Amino acid sequence: MSPESTGPAAVIVLAAGAGTRMKSRTPKILHEIGGRSMVGHALLAARSINPEKLALVVRHERDRVAEHVSAADPEALIVDQDEIPGTGRAVEVALKALDAGAELAGTVVVTYGDVPLLTGELLAELVSTHESERNAVTVLTAVLDDATGYGRILRAEDGTVTGIREHKDATEEERSIREINSGIYAFDAAVLRKALESVTTDNAQGEMYLTDVLGLARDAGGRVAAVVTEDRWQVEGANDRIQLSALGAEHNRRIIESWMRAGVTVVDPSTTWIDSTVTLDEDVRLLPNTQLHGTTTVARDAVVGPDTTLTDVNVGEGAKVIRTHGSGSTIGANASVGPFTYLRPGTVLGETGKIGAFYETKNVTIGRGSKLSHLGYAGDAEIGEDTNIGCGNITANYDGEKKHRTVIGSGVRTGSNTVFVAPVTVGDGAYSGAGAVIRKDVPPGALAVSLAAQRNAEGWVLANRQGTASALLAQAALTPASPSSQSPATTEEGNQA
């Protein structure tokens, strides 16, 4: 189904479960995989088939889930499930909400908020099959080696689906069936509406099972069929942390393979993690232990890694980022960062610039070709073009109450261990001496020094550190050599014998 195709009348996403096996204060469907919540993945897949309406059923942590869903998909209708349990009841209340004003006609798709690998392509296939075969119900199924816990698909001799038996209600013979119900369906809206009127809670769980609709539809003369997917991961849900981890790993594997097919080199896929929201160009090279999160983008010919984590960072063409932890930053084309660099939000490094080893930056703009090579901190600052910041330089931006800015011009050269006490401005082409503490503005082209003349307190170590190794070595160095210690090859006159 292409983006221009007419989609189903509605998609209903079921997300009311408590997810107790996750053992978390965070609602199960809000746990993330690949940089997006599980329900976020579900909403994305649902929207991709262009439904006329989309509803999401909530109950557990209702307000928290509703807020998240509204932010992710403002057009989604939030529906509250009442005290009557079961998927059948969840769909019933959603359908009533969707029917407000005018009853739905056409196809209604039901899916879940905890099936993060389900794709829009598979949902589109389900809808297409359902409508082309004029089915009353079409269920998405998969064949598993171990079907424990899943509802089993019951079929007639002609292959049509006669019903679904929940695992806890299944006989031993039925439990041997390996074809399972994914819980994802396409219904004719009128058939669904009518069948739900007859669904009861008369079962082992005391719930309204949505699966009962299949039998009721068949009894009413409707055709019930299935679409079988060979990709079991698309119908796998996450009920606990173990399943969440497995789904996350599979999702990451698919993302990495997709990028490699698109021209990205991933040296070690087993140690590389890429969120689904990341964008990479051709000929990007990712080295081992690289993690790319959020809205990170990496341009052509850039190299990232090893041992690098970037979140919401834009990396320019041909840039190199080595052993760096960065967030909310921009790295210009052909710039270099690292190793052991910490880029905090607001860092902007210009083209061909450099932030080197053991540097931390925050809310700083660094001009084209400027270099901060090693051992320093630059925060709340603006640095011009082609400036060289010496080793150990620091912008002292915080006075204990407020943050202040440092402005350093273009073509500036600063000596080692210079401290800029903000607010302060250094003009274009200025220099600072080693160890300078810059408290006042420096005019363009000036040399700023702030150290007093050096004073040597001779004999201080001998007087104050008696008996130490330093004192003993100093004493030996200060004691004149005796005649007997002179080389026998030298005469009293100092001439060679």
What are these regions (language model features)?
Residues 63, 118-204, 211, 229:
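Conserved core of the sugar-phosphate nucleotidyltransferase
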Residues 26-32, 83, 199-202:
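Short glycine-enriched, charge-decorated loop/helix-capping segments at active-site entrances
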Residues 1-10, 32, 36-113, 117-128, ...:
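Conserved N-terminal catalytic core of the sugar/cofactor nucleotidyltransferase
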Residues 51, 103-105, 134-137, 222:
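Short, high-confidence coil segments that cap the C-terminus of an alpha-helix
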Residues 316, 320-497:
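Glycine-rich hexapeptide-repeat left-handed beta-helix
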Residues 224-247, 278-281, 287-299, 303-321, ...:
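Terminal amphipathic helices with adjacent charged low-complexity linkers/tails
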Residues 3-7, 178-281:
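Conserved alpha/beta core of the MobA/IspD/sugar-nucleotide pyrophosphorylase nucleotidyltransferase superfamily
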Residues 15, 58, 112, 141-142:
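Short beta-strand/turn micro-motifs composed of small residues
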